[in-house]
């Protein structure tokens, strides 16, 4: 998207990494520094809105039951919509690099999404696996999958590899931001 004046930042992180906390703090920092319009977009929400407006689903849970080919079309359409938002502003896309499924890791950013979004930077919010496991166990407000510290470590390593593959397609940079316990403000400043 050569005529784009804005920027697309993709922000990812495992459940329990503190991605949302860091994102909220970063948005406040950008606002206080006088950046132009910054739009936060949840990729899954845009996909759901696309499917609902097409009459394919009534609620978000129905998304998983759509045929794979239709889901891919919705993914592409959502990515193009987000890319258009970034023509003249900063868009931060909140999504997951990989989703752990019973069949293995599912890419959150397949090639056709990366090509449409053409992100300027891909940001991975990480923490020590022990910190993530601890945060998940303390968070009673969310239904989180139970993963061992070793599985969390593998998941983060796989996300790094996936981020580099996405960066290769789009010519993006990749930044890893460590969000240690009690240090969200420092992570957001990065």
Regions of interest found by a model, annotated:
Residues 39-107:
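ATP-dependent small-molecule kinase phosphotransfer cores
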Residues 11:
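Hydrophobic anchor at the beta1->P-loop junction of P-loop NTPases
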Residues 28-39:
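Post-Walker A helix-loop "phosphate-sensing" segment adjacent to the P-loop in P-loop NTPases
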Residues 22:
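Hydrophobic positions on the alpha1 helix immediately C-terminal to the Walker A/P-loop
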Residues 14:
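P-loop (Walker A) phosphate-binding loop of NTP-binding proteins
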